[in-house]
């Protein structure tokens, strides 16, 4: 029996995933904007978020959350982290019992420091909660470039069942049971992407980028393990894979923010010019607090936080990192 998918969120990644699942399952995508809904239904496009892209013709869009989720066998949450709770609470009365809920957002809730699957467990206990993550730049995947992702659920049987829903052509989806590690890998790497973007914007060079990526992976792995993730997860697609893609690509929103900061623009100006959320900007606040909570030293994240929220410059950030004493490679700094 083919599963029915209800996907909440009409941004670039939500639309891309909906177009993928529509090849394997009946899919309805919810978008807030009625014009977007009409465009998807009538022209099979979403020009605002996926310019020049043709969506799967069977994909249907709706501005009604109820219509999107009431018959769904799988709920996919494609909204930003800070909107996640509100949208899920709106959907809750209409979701059937025990339906799996899959998160696409790569962020943490500021007010609670919670991961998205923790929010699912709080609002909808009993529903299997998981995450689809990895080195997944939406536009590349939509246009058919080869890519790989991870579907993580605590129950491997559910992950395996969902694998076939998301896999399509050159988009290969692997399973994992480390939901904590997979979710944290996606959220934490965004801050490191801002750091590499800053270096690129300031013309710091390839060696600097490589150093930030490598030390950044070490940094996010330390916090991830302290919070319950498994070390091997951070060496895989959800950790290193996602980190390398996001830190190396001009298509990455978080890298873009860092790049523009490195060029001298203000954060306010950069955000006002973007039409989608760069999760790392808000996640940085949470990560600095989590680092204190878990007593984990995260020098790169600390310096990025100071640039974003304390008025430090890009040069201040790099000088700050150079003040850390150099020890063993396995140590912070």
What are the residue ranges of the model-derived segments?
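Structural beta-sheet core signal
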Residues: 7, 29, 101-103, 131, ...
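NAD(P)-dependent Rossmann-like dehydrogenase/reductase catalytic/cofactor-binding core
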Residues: 196-197, 225-235, 239, 243-333
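Electropositive phosphate-/nucleotide-binding environments in soluble metabolic enzymes
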Residues: 11, 15, 34, 62, ...
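Internal alpha-helical scaffold of NAD(P)-dependent oxidoreductase catalytic cores
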Residues: 83, 94, 119, 123-127, ...
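Rossmann-like NAD(P)(H) cofactor-binding subdomain of soluble oxidoreductases
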Residues: 55, 61-146, 162-164
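Generic structural signal for residues in well-ordered beta-strands
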Residues: 27, 59-61, 129, 173, ...
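NAD(P)+-binding Rossmann beta1-loop-alpha1 motif at the extreme N-terminus of oxidoreductases
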Residues: 1-53, 58-63, 90
């Amino acid at each position: 029996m083919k599963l029915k998918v209800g996907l909440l969120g009409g941004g670039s990644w939500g639309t891309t995933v909906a177009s993928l699942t529509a090849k394997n399952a009946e899919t309805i995508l919810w978008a807030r904007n009625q014009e977007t809904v009409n465009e998807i239904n009538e022209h099979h496009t979403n020009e605002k978020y996926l310019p020049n892209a043709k969506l799967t013709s069977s994909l249907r869009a709706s501005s009604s959350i109820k219509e999107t989720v009431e018959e769904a066998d799988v709920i996919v949450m494609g909204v930003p982290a800070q909107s996640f709770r509100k949208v899920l609470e709106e959907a809750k009365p209409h979701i059937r019992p025990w339906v799996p809920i899959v998160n696409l957002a790569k962020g943490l809730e500021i007010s609670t420091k919670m991961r998205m699957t923790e929010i699912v467990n709080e609002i909808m206990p009993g529903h299997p909660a998981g995450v689809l993550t990895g080195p997944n730049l939406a536009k590349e995947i939509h246009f058919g470039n080869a890519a790989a992702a991870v579907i993580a659920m605590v129950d491997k049987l559910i992950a395996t069942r969902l694998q076939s829903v998301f896999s399509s052509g050159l988009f290969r989806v692997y399973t994992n049971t480390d939901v904590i590690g997979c979710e944290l890998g996606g959220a934490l790497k965004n801050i490191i992407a801002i750091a590499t973007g800053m270096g690129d914007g300031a013309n710091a060079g390839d060696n600097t980028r490589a150093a930030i990526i490598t030390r950044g992976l070490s940094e996010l792995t330390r916090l991830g393990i302290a919070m319950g993730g498994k070390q091997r997860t951070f060496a895989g697609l959800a950790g290193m894979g996602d980190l390398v893609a996001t830190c190396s690509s001009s298509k990455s929103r978080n890298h873009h923010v860092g790049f523009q900061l490195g060029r001298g623009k203000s954060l306010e100006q950069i955000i006002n010019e973007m039409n989608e959320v760069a999760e790392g900007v808000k996640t940085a606040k949470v990560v600095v607090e989590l680092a204190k909570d878990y007593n984990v030293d995260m020098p790169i994240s600390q310096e990025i936080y100071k640039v974003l929220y304390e008025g430090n410059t890009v040069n201040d950030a790099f000088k700050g990192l150079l003040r850390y004493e150099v020890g063993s490679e396995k140590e912070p700094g």
